[in-house]
Amino acid sequence: MRIDKFTTAFQTALADAQSLAVGRDHQFIEPAHVMKVLLEQTQGTVAPLLEQSKVNLSRLIDGVNKAIDSYPQVEGTGGEVHVSRELSKILTLMDKFAQQNKDQYISSEWFIPAALEAKGQLRDVLIEAGADKKAIEKNIMNLRKGERVTEQSAEDQRQALAKYTIDLTEKAETGKLDPVIGRDEEIRRTVQVLQRRTKNNPVLIGEPGVGKTAIVEGLAQRIVNGEVPEGLKQKRLLALDMGALIAGAKFRGEFEERLKAVLKDIAKEEGRVILFIDELHTMVGAGKAEGAMDAGNMLKPALARGELHCVGATTLDEYRKYIEKDAALERRFQKVLVEEPSTEDAIAILRGLKERYEVHHGVEITDPAIIAAATLSQRYITDRNLPDKAIDLIDEAASQIRMEMDSKPVELDRLERRLIQLKIEREALKKETDEASKKRLSDLETEIKNVEKEYSDLEEVWKSEKASLHGTQQIKEELEQARIELEAAGRAGDLARMSELQYGIIPELDKKLKAASQKEEQFHDHKLLRSRVTEEEVAEVVSKWTHIPVSKMLEGEREKLLHMETELHKRVIGQDEAVNAVANAIRRSRAGLSDPNRPVGSFLFLGPTGVGKTELCKALAVFLFDTEDAMVRIDMSEFMEKHSVARLIGAPPGYVGYEEGGYLTEAIRRRPYSVILLDEIEKAHNDVFNVLLQVLDDGRLTDGQGRTVDFRNTVIVMTSNLGSDLIREFSGENYDKMKDAVMEVVAQHFRPEFINRIDEAVVFHSLKKEQIRNIAIIQIDRIKKRLKEKDYQLTISDDALDYLSELGYDPVYGARPLKRVLQQQLENPLSQKILEGKFVPGSLINIEKKGEQLEFKEA
């Protein structure tokens, strides 16, 4: 018999049976070897066929294994095996059955009827497992659906829908899909398009994370519950698995063959199947090779003829990039736009999903946590969309609590380490014989007993808490399962089971859950374990994602912002008008009175050099974000040429450096919450101001690659020396008079539309002598801090402080000369004395004024 008459799948089975016989040292390939291999084929037709024919597969596998074990083992054959007489007879019968059915190739399923007709060991095993020849032949006809085997790869194309699609309606029936809340308008629109006579293929278009796939899952649930028009009832919604379709398609045309088989099976279903293609743009160009047709082109005829009922989903960008380019494909789909839900809708969606996440993580999710997830994600995570980002927050916060519950509490861990430490000490003291050691040993024994008792008590509490939490999780899982069963019973019309569940099992589980929750409440005061996701946990996750200190977000807004001036004045001496202006802008923003679509605040700081313009920015960054790193500093003197604008926002397409992005836009994309300092703004080219106009007005900027960067959470500060000579001139005059004079100079330099967009222009005063003295105290405190790290202490007398302040005072240059004076008069001589060894670590250094210089003494 010619081996090439068999299908590819059966040829593979024969080869595997041969290697099985060789591995077991058998002389012949027996039918049992082939049977074992056919049953183990992952995508074979024999196992499903036997299952449909009510054959007991586990009994059959046992029988086949026993038969293989009974064959004699022959050594010294050199791996040479032959087809046994029994197998040869079965193969001949398979050929006969194939010819009777007018098949061109012999397929695997004929092996079973042939084995049952040929009298042999395998026939007895099959009959014992419950095989019936007539039932199997009938199921073969059902499997083939009147088709003949005309290709060697025919078996691979069978049951294409089962292999290459995922049944969403089946998932909905078994309760494996998450509930879909809201989105009624989009689902109704999708159903409306599906009901059309032609072009009945909706494509859901929306930003990533707005819930396009969820809408299709919602449709599957509605089909299952019968909440759809008559035309859609009893239909199956299948999701095309592109990965399975492409995976393993090694040869040219194999991918097209598989897709053709899927389309053929769908056509046979005669409209009873709706195909869902997620990431629809992947179909355009999939399987494309030189001279070959891609998947998108293969779909067109089926879509045009109405054989294929299809729902697609893709993002706006990908739709434009791939589908709109192919006008013939685009016209076959009807667009359904999916907008991002509002915060209120997102809260409703989260409330609907809450139970699923509680069961999965085994924690309780509070309602304030849900509200916090929606509001905080909308406010702070601007580059993603609701409800996806809010769901992620809840999911991560719940997994964090679960992780804490599963690991040992910090308090227990600390006691355990302490116990180990004490026991090591006890072992060391046992070797000592002096009285002090013996006394310490007896004290140690008492301490060990106390710590052991404390540890065991705490461990007991921890175990009981853990057990109570585990109890509620188990009850919640049972309750969810009971509800899924109730829905299934309702669909099946099983009234007895429905009443048993609704009036017996579910109320009983509710009662158990209530009791377990009350027991859990008893532990709530002295918790070792957190079992609830509150707004605090959600805020913690937000801070991990966005680097905003969580305490700052949860601290009462009033308390935090009312003492803002005091905090800023710890670093910035004088300049009350500037500090108040900044504080008021931040307060307006946080109280929700300022425009949410503009930056938190935009300021123009004007004043002479060294008066604290840049220092105020640093103080603001520390106050708002706890770190100076949150300040993006750009020296505008570097942007004096017209073309340097590209450095801020990125080079346009076609230019070198296009992929790299801009300095300003990239910094804010990575850290959207920062203080932006544009130093020496008057030195920049005029075109740079044009770029800043939309940042100051709309809080947004489009970079070289067309991405919108969000500046709404930034504080923008620009500094300038314009009019500094006037500030010195008007130093004794009224502040408003001085400001008006300076603003006249500013108006001559900057365009009106630029000045008009700034929240406030603040004029800094020249520093007075007493302010320089206060700055000297701050600077010396920093030196003390650095010395403390090296284990030195420093004190300075008032005389010495006055002397340094006097030397450092310069009305023209501000506080910078003071820094130089401290360097020359204090840091230089002190570092020399430390290196000479006059002061050793641990010493207290006292600085006093002696004549016209400072004296350093060890106190």
Swiss-Prot record:
The species this protein was found in: Coxiella burnetii (strain RSA 493 / Nine Mile phase I)
Q: Which Gene3D superfamilies match?
A: 1.10.8.60, Clp, N-terminal domain, P-loop containing nucleotide triphosphate hydrolases
The annotated region (Repeat 2) lies at 83-146
InterPro entries linked to this entry: AAA+_ATPase, ATPase_AAA_core, Chaperonin_ClpB, Clp_ATPase_C, Clp_N_dom_sf, Clp_R_dom, ClpA/B, ClpA/B_CS1
Question: How is this protein named in the record?
Answer: Chaperone protein ClpB
Predominant cellular place of this UniProt entry's protein:
cytoplasm
Localization annotation: Cytoplasm
UniProt region (NBD2), positions on chain: 557-766
NCBIfam families named among the record's database cross-references? chaperone_ClpB, PRK10865.1
Domain comment as written in the entry: The Clp repeat (R) domain probably functions as a substrate-discriminating domain, recruiting aggregated proteins to the ClpB hexamer and/or stabilizing bound proteins. The NBD2 domain is responsible for oligomerization, whereas the NBD1 domain stabilizes the hexamer probably in an ATP-dependent manner. The movement of the coiled-coil domain is essential for ClpB ability to rescue proteins from an aggregated state, probably by pulling apart large aggregated proteins, which are bound between the coiled-coils motifs of adjacent ClpB subunits in the functional hexamer.
Q: Where is this region: NBD1?
A: 159-340
Name a GO molecular-function annotation.
ATP binding
Q: Which SUPFAM superfamilies match?
A: Double Clp-N motif, P-loop containing nucleoside triphosphate hydrolases
Per the database entry, which stretches of residues form a coiled coil? 391-525
State which gene encodes it. clpB
